[in-house]
Swiss-Prot record:
HAMAP family tied to this protein: UPF0262
One Pfam family matching this protein: UPF0262
InterPro entries per record: UCP032146
Family the entry assigns: Belongs to the UPF0262 family.
Source organism: Rhizobium leguminosarum bv. trifolii (strain WSM2304)
NCBIfam families linked: PRK02853.1
Protein name, as recorded: UPF0262 protein Rleg2_0240
Length: 157
């Protein structure tokens, strides 16, 4: 373990929920790949990683179980899904519109929907970043990728 190595080296989503649509699974795979490639993840009060993160849903709560690269428990944080419900619902609705639009809409219509989708995604990312304050310090790009994974879990759950 390198002191000060505040990053994720592995991310696993709860497999007990099952798989989703190919589009959602693609989003999951891309988010995990991008997250591992570039992230800033610092559990408050821990000397450094890298870290393994297991994300799951338990009793309608979001669970972040953090371990070191060697598998030593660091912390488990349980967050209420309530602050995310409306954002995730809106995000899924606009994603459906986006996937429909890319099949038949004009480029300007697709761009407008995509801007809305990104705006809602940013709102969810900021909400997650805020909810992690005092528990895990993450930058905005890391929060964005983590929010994508929260959406995947929510969709499958």
């Amino acid at each position: 373990m390198a002191a000060g190595d505040f990053r994720l080296c592995d991310v696993v989503l709860d497999d007990t929920i099952g798989r989703s649509t190919p589009d959602v699974e693609h989003e999951r795979a891309v988010a995990i790949f991008d997250l591992i490639e570039e992230n800033s993840f610092a559990p408050i009060g821990h000397a450094g990683g890298p870290y393994r993160l297991n994300i799951s849903l338990v009793d309608s709560k979001l669970v972040f179980a953090i371990r070191t690269e060697e598998g030593i428990d660091v912390a488990t944080h349980i967050l209420s899904l309530t602050p995310f419900r409306r954002i995730v619902k809106d995000y899924f609705m606009i994603c459906e519109s986006y996937y429909e639009a890319i099949r038949s809409a004009t480029p300007s219509r697709i761009e407008a929907i995509d801007m809305g989708r990104r705006g809602i995604h940013n709102e969810g990312s900021q909400t997650l970043k805020d909810r992690l304050t005092g528990k895990i310090e993450v930058d905005f790009d890391t929060a964005r990728r983590l929010f994508t994974l929260v959406c995947v879990l929510y969709w499958r759950g």
